[in-house]
Design a protein with these regions (language model features):
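Short alpha-helical hairpin
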Residues: 29-33
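Solvent-exposed serine/threonine-rich low-complexity stretches and specific carbohydrate-binding patches
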Residues: 34-47
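Histidine-/acidic-rich catalytic cores in large beta-rich domains
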Residues: 2-28, 49-53, 57-457
Length: 457
């Protein structure tokens, strides 16, 4: 049945039973020569089973799709069944085939689908799934605003569907719960802790300031609690800030949250170009330390919280999508932290600070030479951070994302409307270009193994 739950316009719901236990895969073929076949192995609870219920994704709009199901028995023999489905039109205006600039063999790309989050537009909002050929394989309608990332638990996928709502969706594409955040608006990011609670970046609409709250959502009960107000931790600094050009007191502008265990989180503050570690988030939050520019914080009581910069490099400016990464080769108390370093120097709420004095000379959203992928080694024992890897990427003063995927790095330069997957030597493999009205907010790659598709070994 075509898209019965309304959550992906390029999907089919499939159900059938077999006499013996089998596993299932499918291939979607269209007659258009420039669109390659799309093949996936279906997720099942058991490797071989008799009852089969799943979602086929990847149909091509406005054309006849030939879907071949491969039904494989435990002895390895395979039966096939073919259906033809003519899909109608997309809801949105997005391209079915992105413009691509292929620099190296596409075999070097990691497996997965590029999920384009927030191609901001005044009309209907969507999440898009594109394959490695730049072909659209999923159009996921939202109520409004944007999704910020996909997060998963054992049986569900979660994403934001409006400024005040999160959705829980199962493997079939059925919305199983919608969570309402009440007086709070979500923004930018959300993450699970080790107990399956969701931490969500938010604005308290009853307060004078924005984007400075963290909420806890219990996904079982739907209960929403405020666990952190940065105004409580940085009250003295908040008093010195002024409203920005949108007449908002966006004094911190937290744009990423990473949960790192034991009640500790890392927060990325775009407005202060600072990364903040907060401990005890559930019972008396305290700032453990910060990674930022000492000169920016020098006349405040918070300067003593800054880690020491080790080596000679320009600090991150207006960074996005900080990502916490552990490695067995590192000592306890050490970790990697990588990010999209927008390489912009601006704080509208602190207009007197001259970012160019510390090397961040560009304050324009679009007119910079380049942004960067930055990777720090943070050493909590020594109280230091050092730049261990970086490379230049197309400039975007705001939004954007970086994601390590396998040995590669995926970078979205949001205000350019492009995303590129780079190899382990930081050489571009393929760049994809989208039509966009304002920007592409983020692009992350997901394999969907264990969700839509079979778990990889």
């Amino acid at each position: 049945e075509y898209n019965p739950f309304g959550t992906n316009t390029q999907s089919l719901y499939v159900y059938f039973e077999t006499d013996s236990a089998v596993k299932v895969s499918y291939t979607i073929h269209v007659k258009e020569d420039d669109i390659a076949d799309f093949s996936r192995n279906v997720y099942q609870d058991e490797e071989y089973q008799k009852e089969h219920e799943f979602q086929v994704i990847g149909l091509i709009p406005d054309t006849e799709n030939t879907i071949t199901f491969y039904i494989t028995n435990e002895d390895g023999s395979t039966d096939t069944k073919e259906i033809v489905y003519e899909m109608g039109s997309l809801y949105g205006e997005e391209a079915v085939q992105l413009d691509t600039d292929v620099k190296q063999s596409a075999d070097k790309l990691e497996d997965g689908l590029y999920v384009v989050l927030g191609n901001d537009s005044p009309s209907m909002d969507f999440m898009y799934y594109y394959d490695n050929n730049g072909v659209l394989r999923g159009e996921v309608p939202l109520l409004g605003y944007r999704s910020h990332r996909l997060i998963f638990d054992e049986n569900s996928m979660y994403y934001s569907i409006s400024e005040k709502k999160m959705a829980q969706v199962n493997r079939l594409g059925q919305v199983t719960k919608v969570y309402d955040l009440g007086n709070y608006k979500l923004h930018h990011d959300y993450v699970f802790d080790e107990n399956g609670n969701m931490l969500i970046l938010a604005t308290d609409t009853t307060q004078d300031s924005v984007e400075d709250i963290v909420l806890k959502l219990d996904v079982n009960s739907g209960e929403v609690t405020e666990v952190l107000d940065l105004g409580d931790l940085f009250g003295e600094y908040k008093k010195t800030c002024v409203k920005n050009s949108s007449d908002e007191l966006d004094w911190m502008h937290i744009n990423t949250i990473q949960y790192i265990g034991n009640g500790s989180v890392l927060l990325s503050s775009r407005e202060t170009s600072t990364i903040i570690k907060v401990d005890n988030i559930y019972d008396g939050p305290v700032v453990s330390y910060m990674i930022g520019e000492k000169d920016f914080w020098k006349d405040t009581s918070y300067v003593s919280l800054l880690l020491n910069k080790k080596g000679d490099f320009t600090i991150q400016g207006g960074q996005h999508t900080i990502t916490y990464e552990t490695d067995e080769s590192l000592a306890d108390g050490q970790y990697y932290l990588y990010m999209f370093d927008n390489n912009i120097g601006i704080s509208e709420t602190r207009p007197d600070y001259d970012w160019s004095s510390i090397g961040l000379k560009v304050s324009s959203a679009v007119d910079g030479k380049n942004s960067k992928y930055y990777k720090y080694l943070v050493d909590e024992n020594e109280g230091t951070f050092e730049l261990v890897d970086s490379f230049k990427v197309p400039y975007s003063g705001y939004v954007s994302s970086a994601q390590e995927t396998g040995d590669n790095v995926l970078v979205d330069s949001g205000l350019k409307g492009t995303f590129t997957e780079y190899d382990a030597d930081h050489k571009a493999i393929v760049t994809y270009k989208m039509d966009y009205e304002k920007f592409i907010y983020r692009v992350f790659k997901y394999k969907f193994d264990g969700f839509y598709f079979e778990k990889s070994e």
